[in-house]
Amino acid sequence: MTVMQHTLKIRRPDDWHLHLRDDAMLHSVLPYTSRHFSRAVVMPNLVPPITSVEQCIAYRQRILDAVPQGHAFTPLMTCYLTDALSVDTLMHGQREGVFTAAKLYPANATTNSACGVTSIPGLYPLFEAMQQSGMPLLIHGEVTQADIDIFDREARFIEQVMLPLRRDFPELRIVFEHITTREAAQFVAEGDRYLAATITPQHLMFNRNHMLVGGIHPHLYCLPILKRSVHQQALRKAATSGQTCFFLGTDSAPHLRGRKESACGCAGVFNAPTALQAYATVFEEEQALQHLEAFCSLNGPAFYGLPANEAYIELAQEPASVVDSIASGDETLTPFLAGETLRWSVRA
């Protein structure tokens, strides 16, 4: 990393948690990732979900076909775990270089997770095979019981699922995705080299007051939901600490404006256009710019056993205005920090 007055040069980053959707939406949103990020772990929660090698190969090709000319971008594909998925399918996908990782959604925990897992113990044969092969398990870490408060679901997931899982599969490589609580940050920080976590820009910049005070702000609504300020501060401390177990994962999750601004709005923040600038802002505020490159560009590849990118990207302390909306077909998307002026600009 090179730091000059008002500029910062870092290895080109990767996004270790990304939703690209499909069809017209894919073509609308992909350029905002590929212009800043060299690789991204692409989530499999399409309708229907990506549960076979053939589906995954076809989806990967649709992504590659949508990459703008002049952009160098590699999608890293994932398999959607279900109660019925076989060990043979998962391991075949890994051997063929199709599945980089497997994604565990508890059933009905978030967008397009109805086909998700209903029994964690039922997946133990998959976890054993993944532990032996070194394949990472990516987890949306929330319990879904109706009697558990939505703000408590991540902390309860640690107690009910993560602790037994780590006990039973101590060398299974696990990414606790988009962590949102002090408990999760502490759990990962105290773990070993087989445990890591991604953190989103919205959970670093905002807490539930920002979403709910003065009216409901639907474009900050995501799952796991924003928590109290004490959790936000714990996440900021974790992300900027320099610990290698924490790395960038935007969880950029686009929805058309009409589906966000509705009586039953969808969960997800479309942050790809502004994520890198947002992370830089947080690290600057925490006086930790010296750790930004590791968080964005080094820790993730190291955990996945991949080389860091050789290309570089430059961030400059220059004001950048965020547009209010982005076209997607005949409708629009609202980007994270829409209408605001950012402190940082990216020179790709």
From Swiss-Prot:
Substrate binds at residues 19-21, 45, 140, 223, 255, 267. Binds 2 Zn(2+) ions per subunit. Its EC number is 3.5.2.3. Zn(2+) 1 binds at residues 17, 19, 103, 251. Its cofactor is Zn(2+). InterPro entries: Amidohydro-rel, DHOdimr, Dihydroorotase_CS, Metal_Hydrolase. SUPFAM superfamilies: Metallo-dependent hydrolases (SSF51556). GO terms for molecular function: dihydroorotase activity; zinc ion binding. Keywords: Hydrolase, Metal-binding, Pyrimidine biosynthesis, Zinc. Zn(2+) 2 binds at residues 103, 140, 178. Pathway: Pyrimidine metabolism; UMP biosynthesis via de novo pathway; (S)-dihydroorotate from bicarbonate: step 3/3. The keyword Signal does not apply. NCBIfam families: pyrC_dimer. This is Dihydroorotase. It comes from Edwardsiella ictaluri (strain 93-146). The lineage of its organism: Bacteria, Pseudomonadati, Pseudomonadota, Gammaproteobacteria, Enterobacterales. The gene is pyrC.
